[in-house]
Amino acid sequence: HSIFDWISRDRDVVSLYQSDEKCNFIFTATGFRDLYTLLIKANAVQTFRRTPHDLPLLFLAGDKDPVGRYGEGVRRVVNLYRGAGVKNIEVIFYKDARHEVLNELGRLDAFADISRWLESQLTACAEPAHETAQPTAT
């Protein structure tokens, strides 16, 4: 076991994380301040209200992610977006996955879900708009 087990069930990913000096460091005071500022802004009511109602959103999360409070935090954010009028939201929880679903044992499922979701959004954008025919002068 490692203090980094919250990241992924994949031992190789955790080992790489532990040995990477760009991942395994203590934030500076400025780093903590910037992270705190970002979290405050990201969770502000205005952020949700300003989000375009037609913006498609995809949330992927592990149901064993302590950072997302085991799904509770993700559900809270999704409900805030829905409450602000955002309509096209899809949420996928991966069973037993932890924080980094793209670096988890089931990462291929997550990549497939992203691909499917992107294709569905592109298909929706490509559908012809229903335009009213304009009379032409003769």
Predicted features along the sequence, with ranges:
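Catalytic active-site module of serine/aspartate enzymes centered on a nucleophile-bearing elbow/loop
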Residues: 84, 88-138
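Low-complexity, glycine/alanine/valine/leucine- and proline-rich hydrophobic stretches
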Residues: 79-83
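Conserved strand-to-loop "acid loop" that flanks and positions the catalytic carboxylate
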Residues: 59-67
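Alpha/beta-hydrolase
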Residues: 1-60
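Short strand->helix junction
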Residues: 24, 66-67, 100-101
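Alpha-helical elements of Rossmann-like donor-binding domains used by nucleotide-donor carbohydrate transfer enzymes
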Residues: 34-37, 75-76, 109, 113
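Phosphate/oxyanion-binding active-site loops and adjacent basic polyanion-contact surfaces
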Residues: 28-31, 69-70, 110
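Conserved alpha/beta-hydrolase "acid-adjacent" motif
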Residues: 66-76
